[in-house]
From Swiss-Prot:
Species whose genome carries this gene: Bacillus cereus (strain ATCC 14579 / DSM 31 / CCUG 7414 / JCM 2152 / NBRC 15305 / NCIMB 9373 / NCTC 2599 / NRRL B-3711)
UniProt similarity note: Belongs to the HAD-like hydrolase superfamily. PpaX family.
GO molecular function: inorganic diphosphate phosphatase activity; magnesium ion binding; phosphoglycolate phosphatase activity
Swiss-Prot/TrEMBL cofactor(s): Mg(2+)
Gene name of the encoded protein: ppaX
Name the record gives this protein: Pyrophosphatase PpaX
Length: 216
């Protein structure tokens, strides 16, 4: 079966938001729990939804902590977000070759749009599915299924690319092929444990992988 659709996670995959996310968590947690959290403590929080993360810390303060996080994240977005090499060129080439391309993210739409505009990727994507569009987040298959439905694509024709186990397992649950990115903050070995079909050392590795898959 030929691959004609590529779905991407956003944070840590297409754009480097690691410092923004870590700083947003530290700001929020130090506001409510001064001097209790360090950088290494918040690394496991990258990937799950904000609601899932904060509800494990204090269910009574979930909504206000989410508000605090998002306000800081919004205010410091452009100064802390960076690009990854070859991402722009690769997505542009996929679009040029006729692939359907979409984003499946656990982020809110407002900050998704900020990141896409900042990185100039906003012109390429046919579909963007955010946490605002679904009831269940990755690794539940719903977000990927919604993106595939909107793109009129079948799971077996699609590849999911991401930096977190939620992306890889989400792709597996939805029936797509999966590609993990080695630049994940959690380390290459962390993602290899979830057995993605492919491992990318840079985003442009996607192009020969897809070419080979569609040739066989």
């Amino acid at each position: 079966m030929r691959i004609n659709t590529v779905l991407f996670d956003l944070d840590g995959t297409l754009i480097n938001t690691n410092e923004l996310i870590i700083s947003s968590f530290l700001h929020t947690l130090n506001t409510y729990y001064p001097n209790q959290y360090k950088r290494e403590d918040v690394l496991p929080f990258i990937g799950p939804s904000l609601h899932d993360t904060f509800s494990k810390i204090d269910e009574s303060k979930v909504e206000e902590m989410i508000t605090s996080y998002r306000e800081f994240n919004h205010d410091h977005h452009d100064e802390l977000v960076e690009e990854y090499e070859t991402v722009y060129e690769t997505v542009r080439e996929l679009k040029k070759q006729g692939y359907k391309v979409g984003i499946v993210t656990t982020k809110a739409r407002q900050t998704v749009e900020m990141g896409l505009q900042l990185s100039k990727l906003d012109e390429f994507f046919d579909v963007v599915v955010t946490i605002d569009d679904v009831e269940h987040v990755k690794p539940h298959p719903e977000p990927l299924q919604k993106a595939l439905e909107l793109l009129d694509a079948k799971p077996e024709e699609a590849l999911m690319v991401g930096d977190n186990h939620h992306d890889i397992v989400g792709g597996q649950n939805a029936g797509t092929k999966t590609a993990a990115v080695s630049w994940t903050l959690k380390g290459r070995a962390y993602l290899e444990a979830y057995k993605p079909d492919f491992m990318l050392d840079k985003m442009s590795d996607l192009l020969p992988i897809l070419s080979n898959m569609n040739r066989s």
